[in-house]
Design a protein with these regions (language model features):
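N-terminal secretory signal peptides that target proteins for export/translocation
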Residues: 1-8
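Bacterial N-terminal signal peptides
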Residues: 10-23
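Histidine/acidic residue-rich metal-binding segments in metalloenzymes
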Residues: 27, 53-56, 78-83, 89, ...
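An N-terminally biased module of ancient metal coordination in phosphate/nucleic-acid-related enzymes
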Residues: 28-90
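Hydrophobic faces of well-ordered beta-strands that scaffold small-molecule active sites
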Residues: 34-40, 68-70, 94-97, 125-127, ...
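Glycine-rich phosphate-binding "P-loop"
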Residues: 38-48, 130-153
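Short acidic/histidine-rich active-site segments
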Residues: 228, 249-266
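Mid-to-C-terminal alpha-helical segments outside catalytic/metal-binding sites
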Residues: 269-303
Length: 303
């Protein structure tokens, strides 16, 4: 009798789902089989969360998902990804580092250390999020913040982090930078040879959402753009569907950004997002591209 490893079983399920999708055009948008959540929050965290990362991985695996990326605004998650993989085999789990104040802000040493964590599952660098200058000023908060640009120039430590992303083939995310900052960062990242750049929740960014024209420029420069649950509204879905039609699905990644106690579970939110976009005219093949193939390419899963 032939025995298959858990990862091979998942790949077989993905292939069977793809075959079903070829026969039933809408099938891939009605299921999470093979999907990847590039932006998943869970406990342990200093912020209240709906579910811990072990149960999150179990739920994602039960739904047939291929991978999740664990995000925490204030703690690196590469080591957490290693532990979750041991506890929940059969789904690929990745982590990263968000360059907020608890890791020293934009700290090249912290990024370098993350790349050394056993397993090599630290794949993503988020430039400052909650502590970004753009969000702190936009929220009119008092207190320190982490800057990425000053007087129109990218700061030296940010240039170093971009260089590390290129060196270690990491996914560089813009975090909660402003649209203007993000475009500067994307151009510099491409100049330094970063292969994988993602604009974090491009249309709902607390540091300032991108306009359609700014998203077009980001895509032209070589970045992909993330769309998230948010939570969903009819207006948001209409605007996202219009952006997908204008730029093309090849430029987008669909993530949940879920884990908040008041919001749905990640799996439920992703399905609602897929169905909502389809109701606004986005095709099943585009959902497949944005939820499966594009994030897999960012993570290097199909090499």
């Amino acid at each position: 009798m032939m025995h298959l490893s858990p990862n091979r079983i998942v790949r077989v399920v993905v292939l069977l789902a793809a075959a079903a999708g070829a026969l039933l055009p809408d099938a891939s948008a009605q299921t999470l089989v093979g999907a990847i959540d590039f932006h998943a929050h869970g406990d342990p965290d200093g912020t209240a969360r709906k579910i811990d990362v072990i149960d999150l991985a179990k739920a994602a695996k039960a739904a047939g998902m291929r991978a999740i990326v664990i995000k925490n605004h204030y703690e690196p998650t590469a080591s957490l990804a290693y532990i979750v993989r041991k506890e929940v085999p059969g789904i690929e789990v990745f982590g990263g580092i968000s360059l907020d104040l608890t890791v020293g802000g934009v700290n090249p040493a912290a990024v370098e250390w993350m790349t050394k964590v056993k397993g090599g599952y630290g794949k993503v660098v988020w430039l400052p999020t909650f502590d970004s200058e753009a969000q702190v000023l936009r929220d009119k908060r008092q207190g320190p913040f982490a800057s990425v640009v000053r007087n129109g120039q990218i700061l030296p430590e940010v240039l170093q982090v971009i260089g590390l992303a290129a060196k270690h083939d990491l996914v560089l995310e813009t975090g909660h930078s402003s649209p203007k900052e993000s475009l500067l960062l994307i151009a510099e990242a491409k100049r330094q040879g970063v292969q994988h750049i993602l604009v974090t929740h491009a249309m709902t960014n607390p540091g300032g959402p991108m306009s359609l024209e700014e998203m077009q420029e980001a895509a032209r420069l070589g970045a992909m753009l993330e769309l998230v649950y948010s939570p969903l509204t009819d207006r948001q879905l209409q605007q996202e569907a219009e952006a997908i039609r204008t730029l093309g699905a090849a430029s987008f990644v669909l993530s949940s950004d879920l884990g908040q106690p008041q919001n749905p579970l990640h799996t439920d939110g992703l399905l609602a997002m897929y169905k909502g976009l389809m109701a606004n005219g986005v095709g099943a093949s585009d959902i497949d591209l944005m939820s499966r193939r594009n994030p897999a390419r960012l993570l290097g899963l199909d090499r």
